[in-house]
């Protein structure tokens, strides 16, 4: 290519960057020039841009929806190959850690809000403001956006879909007990009635997951419901506060109503226990509907049997708190520039209404739309599963509207900015504290101090 051709190409690139030349005109002119210059040469196949994207939705229906969206994207972008892979969060966490250690991250992935804080501080991800603005910042629930917009004014991720944890109870276990869950407001109300719902070994009044990741969920939610937090205003552990001590005492009082071996149960075991009638209540999500359809008798697969019960507050709390599942897409800074640009193009395509609806409909009561308008759209609300489980849908929407659905370990909104929140979440320290008290009878104040000291010594101390 001669100097004249080089100057012309540079001018095209400059005009494209300045926005004076549209994408289509830029590509058309560039292609025409390339054709003239390359005419005498033998044609070669264009190398595709391979984009690796990991998400946390391995559900077969969701994989089918993602596959269809990717195929439609490929029809429009023949120079890009999207390699989409779904896996559970535990597998994702391990795979991401290995990829980071090897300095070979994917182009983009789902992650947790607390991981965004950590990755942002370490320079591992980059902002996605252009994606948020392209799909319509003003169209998205503010309570979805708030957790990923940082003090620098930038969005460091975009939530793929959301859900809020709800307290589920078996309505068919209430007759003859005198229990009215809708009257519950406090932990004392709950503790008063749990004995009436406990019929071992047939079923237990409550089931909880004892795996550390899920124990962390209950720690920060119950801390928040008792007016406290895992952290103080300076980001230091607040585990010796009266609110946390009270939360641990509450957990001890729940133990008689939990099934044997609960401390080794994972989240899926608790859902199946509720669906099969082995537990009267559970902390659950919208995807639990699938377990009900799989395990419960046909005549019980409805919200009259599988009810929404209110979450309660501790003696120092003012409002209950629930977990917000808002795993965001993030773009990794070390990925090649062309891959990052292609990943952003795919995300813009993914969030187009006709594509995004297919994705959300794959798990209709759990993968909830980030767009406000969908919750006023009859075609969205009248999906058969959303109609069947309308009380579940309404309960989740209410949590978002009142602003009491927070991401993992975020009892207070400012907690999301704590640099080591991800390291605390990844450690077993909080779960060890709970098990020491609930399973081994350790004094809550002693266990809380030991956990606090570990966080200061092993996490905060090493972060400085």
Place the predicted regions along the sequence by residue.
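Conserved C-terminal helix/tail region of periplasmic/extracytoplasmic solute-binding proteins
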Residues: 175, 390-391, 400-464
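N-terminal secretory signal peptides
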Residues: 1-21, 29-34
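Helix-loop-helix "hinge/cap" segment bordering the ligand-binding cleft or interdomain interface
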Residues: 75, 132-134, 149-217, 226-265, ...
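Extracytoplasmic/periplasmic substrate-binding proteins
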Residues: 56, 116, 217-221, 248-349
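Hinge/lid segment of periplasmic solute-binding proteins
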Residues: 113-166, 188-191, 199, 218, ...
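C-terminal lobe and pocket-closing loops
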Residues: 287-301, 314-428
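Short, well-ordered beta-strand elements
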Residues: 47-58, 80-85, 108
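Extracytoplasmic "Venus flytrap"/periplasmic binding protein-like
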Residues: 68, 72-143, 147, 172-178, ...
């Amino acid at each position: 290519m001669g100097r004249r051709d080089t100057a012309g190409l540079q001018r095209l690139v400059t005009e494209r960057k300045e926005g004076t030349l549209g994408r289509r005109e830029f590509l058309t002119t560039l292609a025409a020039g390339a054709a003239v210059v390359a005419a005498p040469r033998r044609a070669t196949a264009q190398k595709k841009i391979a984009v690796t994207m990991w998400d946390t939705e391995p559900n077969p229906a969701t994989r089918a929806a993602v596959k269809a969206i990717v195929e439609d994207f490929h029809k429009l972008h023949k120079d890009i190959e999207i390699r989409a892979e779904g896996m559970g969060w535990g597998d994702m966490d391990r795979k991401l850690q290995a990829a980071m250690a090897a300095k070979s991250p994917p182009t983009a992935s789902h992650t947790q809000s607390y991981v965004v804080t950590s990755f942002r501080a370490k320079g591992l991800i980059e902002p996605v403001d252009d994606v948020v603005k392209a799909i319509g910042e003003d169209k998205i629930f503010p309570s979805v956006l708030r957790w990923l917009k940082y003090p620098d004014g930038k969005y460091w991720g975009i939530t793929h879909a959301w859900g809020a944890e709800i307290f589920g109870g078996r309505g068919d276990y209430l007759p003859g007990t005198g229990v009215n869950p809708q009257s519950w407001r406090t932990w004392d109300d709950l503790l008063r009635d749990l004995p009436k719902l406990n019929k071992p070994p047939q079923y237990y009044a409550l089931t909880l997951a004892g795996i550390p990741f899920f124990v962390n969920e209950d720690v920060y939610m119950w801390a928040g419901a008792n007016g406290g937090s895992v952290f103080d205003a300076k980001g230091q552990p607040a585990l010796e506060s009266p609110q946390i001590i009270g939360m641990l005492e509450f957990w001890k009082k729940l133990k008689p109503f939990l099934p044997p071996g609960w401390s080794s149960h994972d989240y899926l075991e608790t859902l199946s226990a509720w669906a099969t009638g082995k537990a009267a209540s559970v902390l659950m999500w919208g995807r639990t509907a699938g377990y009900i359809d799989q395990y419960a008798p046909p005549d019980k697969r409805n919200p009259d049997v599988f009810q929404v019960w209110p979450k309660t507050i501790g003696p120092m709390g003012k409002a209950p708190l629930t977990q917000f599942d808002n795993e965001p897409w993030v773009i990794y800074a070390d990925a090649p520039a062309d891959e990052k640009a292609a990943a952003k193009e795919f995300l813009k395509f993914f969030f187009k209404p006709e594509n995004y609806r297919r994705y959300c409909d794959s798990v209709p009561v759990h993968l909830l739309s980030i767009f406000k308008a969908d919750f006023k759209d009859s075609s969205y609300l009248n999906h058969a599963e959303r109609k069947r489980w309308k009380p579940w849908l309404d309960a989740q929407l209410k949590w978002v509207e009142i602003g009491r659905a927070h991401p993992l370990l975020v009892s207070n909104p400012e907690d999301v900015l704590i640099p080591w929140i991800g390291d605390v979440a990844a450690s077993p320290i909080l779960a060890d504290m709970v098990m020491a008290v609930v399973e081994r009878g350790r004094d809550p104040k002693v266990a809380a101090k030991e956990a606090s000291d570990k966080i200061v010594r092993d996490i905060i101390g090493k972060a400085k």
